[in-house]
């Protein structure tokens, strides 16, 4: 799929001039004070949640470099259709992380969506002079630059909004009411999330940043971690950029960290250095394979694989988890399945059902009535299970005798704190 010249010109204008306004509404009834500090830098409480992003005050613009094509695909046009332009990274998403590096996910079920195509084709986002970009034009650039490694791009868009977009408080319906926005505020938030995510993605042209430093996709060449890090800093105001490699030692993810001044709608992103997360790339001999290359070590995924079976033990104490997700000391631990989620992270499942985290009290539960299967982190080296960027778990009581103890995400000074360790069967 190729963008026509007229649309490309409008997108270039969109990426450079359309977002200078404090808000996108000409007849705004509400605005944010220009004296507000950047997110995660305040010393006193900012009460107006429509003008200050908290607790998710660190905005990550994340990018993919997917290069392995579907089986049998080698034609350049088909490669672009599946993997995006051959000379560009693709968008992964816009994530509101907390100031300490943890994050929330799937924050508001009432705001969840199951469709993007029809929403962006809605009359609310097309044929108006006051729109930064028409919904149909936004959809076309997303089709080109926001690609899924599963081949189902819209499912990735829906996932990114439901997991991350619903956690951005300055896009909540009450804020749109303050600004006197006509139309459906839920739809408006979705439109704004995707247009701002695409705008920031276009501002961070990783491919050209690396190319300017002499780093280009190649089957033969390799690079050092320092070379890549120094190059990426040049494209991020001298701040450290987080990057990751795949199992073949090839560069495949870039994370740009920002703080934010005011509402997300003001788009006043301030580049900051990446929070310490640790890159999995080696110090030397990092590959950056061109799109279309299939490494000799590649093995196609088995679509019928149910996940990795194992048990979940208390990492620094006695006991294990049973089938409902509770901590127990006696008998036999339950079988858990660690299942790769389609767009990153993992699901946990027992014979009772998928495991989830209750947003109100952070309790872990595994059963068929779980409304939203949680996405967990997994540290393959240590075996630890994490949630929302942290690997801390606790219980408020010790499960003596035949007692079961509910397990909660996080830590508690008055509770029993531990890690959860997945042990493969």
Swiss-Prot record:
Glycosylation sites: 42, 134
Catalytic residues in the record: 92, 160, 164
Superkingdom, taxonomy of origin: Eukaryota
Pfam families on file: Ribonuclease_T2, RNaseT2L_C
UniProt keyword annotation of Hydrolase present: yes
PROSITE patterns named among the record's database cross-references: RNASE_T2_2
EC number, UniProt record: 4.6.1.19
InterPro entries cross-referenced by the UniProt entry: Ribonuclease_T2_eukaryotic, RNase_T2-like, RNase_T2-like_sf, RNase_T2_His_AS_2
Gene Ontology cellular-component annotations: extracellular region; vacuolar lumen
Keywords of this entry: Cytoplasm, Disulfide bond, Endonuclease, Glycoprotein, Hydrolase, Lyase, Nuclease, Signal, Vacuole
GO biological process: RNA catabolic process
Disulphide-bonded residues: 32-51, 40-99, 50-175, 107-167, 245-281
GO molecular function, one term: ribonuclease T2 activity
Annotated signal sequence range: 1-18
Alphabetical list of Gene3D superfamilies matching this protein: Ribonuclease T2-like
Reactions this protein catalyses: a ribonucleotidyl-ribonucleotide-RNA + H2O = a 3'-end 3'-phospho-ribonucleotide-RNA + a 5'-end dephospho-ribonucleoside-RNA + H(+)
Localization in the cell: Vacuole lumen; Cytoplasm
Stretches that traverse the bilayer: none
Protein family (similarity comment): Belongs to the RNase T2 family.
Function (record text): Rnase which modulates cell survival under stress conditions. Released from the vacuole to the cytoplasm during stress to promote tRNA and rRNA cleavage and to activate separately a downstream pathway that promotes cell death. Involved in cell size, vacuolar morphology and growth at high temperatures and high salt concentration.
Protein name (Swiss-Prot/TrEMBL): Ribonuclease T2-like
Organism per entry: Kluyveromyces lactis (strain ATCC 8585 / CBS 2359 / DSM 70799 / NBRC 1267 / NRRL Y-1140 / WM37)
Gene: RNY1
């Amino acid at each position: 799929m190729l963008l026509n010249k007229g649309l490309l010109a409008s997108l270039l204008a969109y990426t450079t001039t359309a977002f200078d306004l404090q808000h996108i509404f000409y007849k705004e009834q509400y605005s944010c004070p220009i004296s507000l500090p950047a997110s995660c830098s305040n010393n006193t409480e900012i009460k107006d949640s429509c003008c200050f992003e908290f607790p998710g005050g660190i905005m990550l613009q994340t990018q993919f470099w997917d290069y392995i094509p579907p089986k049998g695909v080698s034609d350049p046009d088909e490669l672009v259709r599946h993997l995006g332009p051959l000379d560009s990274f693709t968008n992964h998403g816009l994530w509101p992380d907390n100031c300490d590096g943890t994050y929330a996910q799937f924050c508001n079920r009432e705001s969840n969506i199951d469709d993007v195509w029809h929403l962006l084709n809605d009359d609310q986002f097309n044929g108006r002079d006051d729109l930064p970009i028409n919904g149909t034009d936004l959809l076309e650039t997303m089709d080109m630059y926001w690609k899924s490694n599963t081949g189902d791009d819209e499912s990735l868009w829906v996932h990114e909004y439901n997991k991350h977009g619903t956690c951005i408080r300055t896009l909540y319906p009450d804020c749109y009411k303050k600004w006197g926005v006509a139309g459906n505020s839920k739809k408006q938030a979705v439109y704004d999330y995707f247009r701002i995510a695409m705008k920031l993605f276009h501002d961070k042209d990783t491919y050209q940043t690396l190319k300017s430093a002499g780093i280009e996709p190649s089957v033969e060449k390799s690079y050092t971690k320092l070379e890549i890090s120094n190059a990426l800093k040049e494209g991020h105001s001298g701040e450290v950029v987080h990057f990751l490699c795949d199992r073949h030692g090839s560069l495949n993810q870039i994370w740009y960290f920002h703080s934010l001044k005011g509402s997300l709608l003001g788009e006043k992103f301030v580049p900051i250095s990446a929070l310490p997360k640790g890159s999995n790339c080696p110090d030397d001999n990092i590959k950056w394979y061109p799109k279309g290359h299939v490494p000799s070590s590649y093995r196609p995924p088995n679509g019928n694989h149910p996940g990795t079976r194992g048990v979940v033990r208390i990492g620094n104490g006695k006991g294990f988890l049973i089938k409902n997700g509770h901590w127990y000391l006696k008998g036999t631990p339950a079988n858990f399945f660690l299942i790769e989620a389609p767009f990153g992270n993992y699901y946990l499942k027992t014979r009772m059902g998928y495991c989830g985290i209750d947003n109100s009290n952070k309790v872990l539960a595994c059963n068929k009535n779980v409304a939203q299967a949680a996405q967990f982190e997994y540290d393959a080296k240590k075996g630890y299970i994490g949630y929302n960027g942290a690997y801390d778990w606790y219980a408020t009581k010790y499960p003596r005798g035949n007692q079961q103890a509910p397990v909660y995400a996080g830590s508690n000074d008055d509770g029993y704190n531990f890690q959860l360790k997945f042990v493969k069967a």
